[in-house]
Regions:
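Catalytic-site microenvironment of enzymes
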Residues: 1-225
Length: 225
């Protein structure tokens, strides 16, 4: 089951949190609307890539019966109508995303973004996590699967999310933020715009979550770094 949030005068969840048992996955496609996020060296807009991967991830979860909430399912911002400037819209959008997440009972958040850097040499996925030990096992599993599926030479480790990331620092649940690749790298820029690669990314993210969930259900602890 998937539930969508739409921009309203004051964005409210269009679902009743009590309908969902523990285990609902919130899929957050970063940015949206006027806030396009980063722009790749070829002109691709981050928010569109985030959304494409998020929709594919949602579809895969649907095949496995994983209940999901998509914070957005189109190129929109979740800001209040009273927000006028781009800054006001960004702030309102983030606050409404936080409110929607916090209204749920123990969700797991997967926030999808793309990276960029002044140098074009950097590439590869990076997983960040919020709320310390609560999210670290899922972050470890996700980083490991991304390495296995996408780039065996990617030796990045899951990292605590920077304090500057508003959404991840204002929610209390299990949450990871996945920078799927670098839009500033020519090869990865093209890959991230590819339908096949987006499917590969979504499959890796879904597989990581499902294997993590199975591990937790067995009472095992993910200690691998």
């Amino acid at each position: 089951m998937t539930v969508y949030l739409q921009a309203q005068t004051a964005v409210q969840p269009t679902f009743s949190p009590t309908r969902f048992a523990e285990g609902v996955v919130v899929i957050d496609a970063g940015h949206g609307g006027e806030d396009g996020g980063a722009v790749s060296i070829s002109g691709a807009v981050e928010s569109n890539i985030n959304l494409a991967i998020a929709l594919r991830l949602d579809a895969i979860f649907g095949l496995y019966g994983v209940p999901t909430v998509l914070l957005r399912d189109s190129d929109i911002s979740l800001h209040d109508e009273q927000a006028n400037t781009l800054r006001e819209k960004k702030v309102s959008d983030l606050k409404n995303r936080v409110a929607a997440i916090e209204a749920l009972d123990e969700p797991t958040v997967i926030s999808i973004h793309q990276n960029t850097y002044p140098s074009s040499k950097y590439h590869g996925a990076q997983v960040f996590y919020a709320n310390g030990e609560l999210s670290l096992p899922l972050a470890r599993q996700t980083q490991a699967v991304l390495k296995q599926v996408l780039d065996p030479e990617n030796d990045r480790m899951p990292t605590a999310v920077p304090s500057s990331v508003y959404l991840m620092n204002h929610i209390s649940c299990k949450a990871i933020l996945v920078e799927c690749g670098f839009l500033s790298n020519p090869e990865e820029d093209q890959l991230l715009q590819s339908s096949d690669y987006q499917k590969k990314l979504a499959t890796a993210l879904a597989g990581a979550y499902l294997s993590y969930r199975e591990t937790v259900s067995k009472g095992e602890i993910l200690n691998a770094s």
